[in-house]
Structures are given as structure tokens and as C-alpha cells.
């Protein structure tokens, strides 16, 4: 057992606590005792397969029918990123019961040796019930420095997927052919108006928002580069404006970019309350007053540390990202990329890289647990 000191917000005194051998954070005592201990399910374990070097880059969404889909890189000859590995596949697992049980690993994208796919991300179209899975592609044998941007689509909640479509020419300029460019892993969004939006990074020219106004039939990008920004996530705010939460390396914090003009112009600020070691993170909308909930809520997950990829933490905002809670630690050890979704039972699902990428774990918890009993999800009454 390892001993630690936990500052009690309610009593303003030091309280001794214990953390179990798996470093799972436990809720402190509050006026409302919330009984839930987190269980970590390692969904992709490279140690069980001799041919796989590692699994990396998690993405998670909830399908239109409520099934949960997790996607990830299956890195075969080495654990190197796309440009340095000639055999990376995109694989998924699915759950029909809020993440209690899972399907076997299913391959979505697997090119011949020498061609690789990496960095999965997904968007769920709640109007058409289609799911779009994006990834970055390279033909390392013939065009070793050229990144292509692909998408596949599922119309049956992730059971089957279409053939890959190359959308590079739609969301990137021709002169960017040899630039280091990629679609950010994790997830994009569908706005209240129905458009699909996502983030694409060109390390030479800045981060660009791309999207579709016709449910994925065609794609476009906004030629208003955002800097500084590496891997980024986008959310729609309650007033219809857009917010991009961005990784920036060697700064020790996140940068936030907002637009009230649908991406024509952007305002940028560094958010000192969102400390970050330079790592991919996740931000999603949990509830919206417009949808009948009593509060607007945003959720943010990352490795909460200025230098090291450790301390996976979830924060909540009630004012559209202007301020954030101190956050609750999910895992204090080695933690890297993360992705979140809202399960059909209203709980929060988290899929993240754990213990130096040796595990890719899923866990879930209620809003009540996350806030130590201070907030509880109330489903809107049907009109």
C-alpha cells in the first residue's frame, strides 16, 4: 500500500488516504457517499500476440443504437508511428452493454505490407445514423514522405465498414503534398445544425478545421489556420460558437481557440488551468440546456502534468470551458492519449493508454462519482 495526502475540499484539512496497488483513485468522503470503484479493462493487449508490437492511439464513440465502439492502431513490426512503420492496421472492438463485455478484435483497415494506416478517429452522424472512421495513410514503399487522409463509413453501428475513401484532395491543398499532415485521432463532432466537423493538422501551416455539410458525401476545410496547435479536439459551445482545445508541445499547458464566426476567425489563449505535458487529450459535451438538461456541461480528460505523461484526470466545466474543476484522478501512473464518450446509460466512458502503452484500458463512471456526489445526471423529461 502506498500512502498519500489528499486535501479535503469540504473540510479544508489534510486527510490521510490510501491508494491500491493499481493506483486507482478513490472518491474522498463527502456529504453524499458515492460508492464506486473503477475497474480497468485492458481491451488491446499486445503481450497476448507474438506478432503485434503494441496497440496505440485510442478512439471511442457511442453508436446510434447505443453500442460502444473503440478503435486503435495495431502496430505490427514495431511500435513506431506511421512514418516509421510499414505495417499498422486499424482494429476495433464493440460492446452492446455499456462496456461490460466486448466483441473479439475486428479488423477495419489492413493494407498489404508496406502500406500503413494510423491514428483512428470517429464521428457519429445522429441524423443519418452513419459512423465515419478517419485515419492517416502512407505508402512507405513508394511515397515514404506523403501522408494521405482516408475515411471509411459504417451504416450498421460498426458491424461492417465501407471501402476506404481518399479525401486528401478535399481537405488539403495540393501544395501540401509532402507536408507532415494528419487528421487528429480521437473524435470529431456533429453540430446542432447537423454539420460534421473535425481537426486536421499541418505542422508547417497550422491546424485546420474540416467538415461536411452533406453528411459525409463531400468534405471541405476552412482555410483559417490555427496556431499554436498540434493534436486538437473541437466542440460546439452553447451559443453555437466553436472551441478547439489544442496540444502544444513544450509549453506545459493547453491552448484554447474559439470562433464566433463558424471558423472564419479565431481568438487564441493559453489556459494555465489545463496543465499538459504535450499529449493528445479529449474534450466532449456531456449535457446541454438546449437538449433539456438543467446544466451545460463539458468534460476534459488528459495526463494532468506539465512534463510527464502521468495522472489521467477528468475535469468538468459548467460555463462552456471558461473555468474547469480541479479534476478527479482516474489513474496516477503512466497515462497518455485518451478518448471519451457518453454511454447510453448516461455514464462517462473513458478509453486511454496506460503504463507506457502496454495497456489500453476502458473504464466508466457516473457524473455523481466524478463530482463526489455534488452533481447528478437527471434525464430531461420527454415533452
Annotate each language-model stretch with its function.
Residues 6-10:
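Sec-dependent N-terminal signal peptides
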